[in-house]
């Protein structure tokens, strides 16, 4: 199995690569982790990971500036239906639009806009930086065997915006930060984490292992 992590100049690329390598090794999964900026590597990969940190508009522009990469994603994810995981802004790019700084077009896989978080508690700081729990809204194979809820494992977040999905069925998990904020989305062979699995220790490694086993 070859897993393509897309290098478009954004994301915790080294830590993401190391986390996927570790998860595969500890789970006994034979996987080559390919950090790549080559569209043909993405189009032919068995699984695709899109990381991302920073502003939506910048990440969208960076991805679109890579000749052939958008077409490669369409080929692998839409046409071949290979498993896809977006991380942080990579997850946000799965949306219809991002409303940070300006209006930017996303991949359109999860209908909805990425909007600024507005916690009901004014003492909560933006961005949300740190550990928080997850509430599962709809069962998903990537959370198999992972304890969630108030007394469950914690995920690591760094974000000021979240995906306001049009369809509640696309929201797999939320996190409470002065209200329910989208933490994980999924539809068909596509999944996305607002948190950073590569920084989320036990929860993150378990989720990555589940992604490597996932057969949507």
UniProtKB/Swiss-Prot annotation:
PROSITE patterns (alphabetical): GATASE_TYPE_1
Subcellular location: Cytoplasm
Pfam families referenced in this protein's UniProt entry, alphabetically: GATase
Domain Glutamine amidotransferase type-1: 2-216
Any Gene Ontology biological process: L-histidine biosynthetic process
Record's keyword terms, sorted: Amino-acid biosynthesis, Cytoplasm, Glutamine amidotransferase, Histidine biosynthesis, Hydrolase, Lyase
A GO cellular component annotation in the UniProt record: cytoplasm
UniProt entry tagged with the keyword Amino-acid biosynthesis: yes
Pathway(s) of this molecule: Amino-acid biosynthesis; L-histidine biosynthesis; L-histidine from 5-phospho-alpha-D-ribose 1-diphosphate: step 5/9
Residue numbers annotated as active site: 88, 196, 198
Family matches, as CDD domains: GATase1_IGP_Synthase
Record-listed E.C. numbers: 4.3.2.10, 3.5.1.2
Listed GO MF terms: glutaminase activity; imidazoleglycerol-phosphate synthase activity; lyase activity
InterPro entries attached to this UniProt entry: Class_I_gatase-like, GATASE, Imidazole-glycPsynth_HisH
Reactions catalysed: 5-[(5-phospho-1-deoxy-D-ribulos-1-ylimino)methylamino]-1-(5-phospho-beta-D-ribosyl)imidazole-4-carboxamide + L-glutamine = D-erythro-1-(imidazol-4-yl)glycerol 3-phosphate + 5-amino-1-(5-phospho-beta-D-ribosyl)imidazole-4-carboxamide + L-glutamate + H(+); L-glutamine + H2O = L-glutamate + NH4(+)
Subunit structure: Heterodimer of HisH and HisF.
Database matches in PANTHER family: IMIDAZOLE GLYCEROL PHOSPHATE SYNTHASE SUBUNIT HISH (PTHR42701:SF1)
Function according to Swiss-Prot or TrEMBL: IGPS catalyzes the conversion of PRFAR and glutamine to IGP, AICAR and glutamate. The HisH subunit catalyzes the hydrolysis of glutamine to glutamate and ammonia as part of the synthesis of IGP and AICAR. The resulting ammonia molecule is channeled to the active site of HisF.
Name of this protein: Imidazole glycerol phosphate synthase subunit HisH
Lineage: Bacteria, Pseudomonadati, Pseudomonadota, Alphaproteobacteria, Hyphomicrobiales
Gene: hisH
